[in-house]
Amino acid sequence: MLLDEGWLAEARRVPSPHYDCRPDDENPSLLVVHNISLPPGEFGGPWIDALFTGTIDPNAHPYFAGIAHLRVSAHCLIRRDGEIVQYVPFDKRAWHAGVSSYQGRERCNDFSIGIELEGTDTLAYTDAQYQQLAAVTNALITRYPAIANNMTGHCNIAPERKTDPGPSFDWARFRALVTPSSHKEMT
């Protein structure tokens, strides 16, 4: 995987307006794994792109009426077939974590990269998703080495509100695919 000015060369780019600059040009030091499906439990279609670009039609599905007002984004989405979609350059602050805290530090969006996996808490993720997540993570570690020691789920930084990536995410499998490091901590 190649990074070019914060973008993955291999990713389909769908620029989101929902981002801003990190404070004091802070480098990312945390990877947050999420899941998403729109409508819930359904895969494919244009809805995730539409949510992250602020163009989701609230009338297209009853669920969308409750989320159309949100201004949210992630850096990347990895679809079930392994396609990588990038919405925000990694050096910018995507709006994926919300109210959050990691190891006593609040406002995780300031110092994290958010990667969404198309899926649910209870359905197994695909081989292609694990392979692509590991490839992206290894590229990020090369650029932002602190990430090697700081990878977690949305459920761990916002436990009162979030459950993703859920029990269906196999952290041991992911860990085995990421470049070995003797000091890695992933929860």
Curated annotation (Swiss-Prot):
Q: Where does Zn(2+) bind?
A: 34, 154, 164
The lineage's top-level taxon is Bacteria
Q: Name one GO biological process term.
A: cell wall organization
An example Gene Ontology cellular component term from the record? cytoplasm
Note the InterPro entries from the entry. Answer: Amidase/PGRP_sf (IPR036505), Amidase_domain (IPR002502), NAMLAA_amidase_2 (IPR051206)
One of the entry's Gene Ontology molecular-function terms is:
metal ion binding
The impact of changing residue 34 to A is: Loss of activity
Any stretches that span the bilayer, and where are they?
Answer: none
Q: What is its EC number?
A: 3.5.1.28
Keywords of the record, alphabetical order, are:
Cell wall biogenesis/degradation, Cytoplasm, Hydrolase, Metal-binding, Zinc
Q: Where is this site: Transition state stabilizer?
A: 162
**Pfam families linked to this entry:** Amidase_2
Q: What is the effect of changing residue 164 to A?
A: Loss of activity
Could you name the active-site residues? 116 (proton acceptor)
Q: How is the cofactor bound?
A: Zn(2+) is required for amidase activity.
- Summarize the protein's role: Involved in cell wall peptidoglycan recycling. Specifically cleaves the amide bond between the lactyl group of N-acetylmuramic acid and the alpha-amino group of the L-alanine in degradation products containing an anhydro N-acetylmuramyl moiety. Is also involved in beta-lactamase induction.
> In which family does this protein belong, per the annotation?
Belongs to the N-acetylmuramoyl-L-alanine amidase 2 family.
Quote the protein name from its UniProt record. Answer: 1,6-anhydro-N-acetylmuramyl-L-alanine amidase AmpD
List the source organism.
Citrobacter freundii
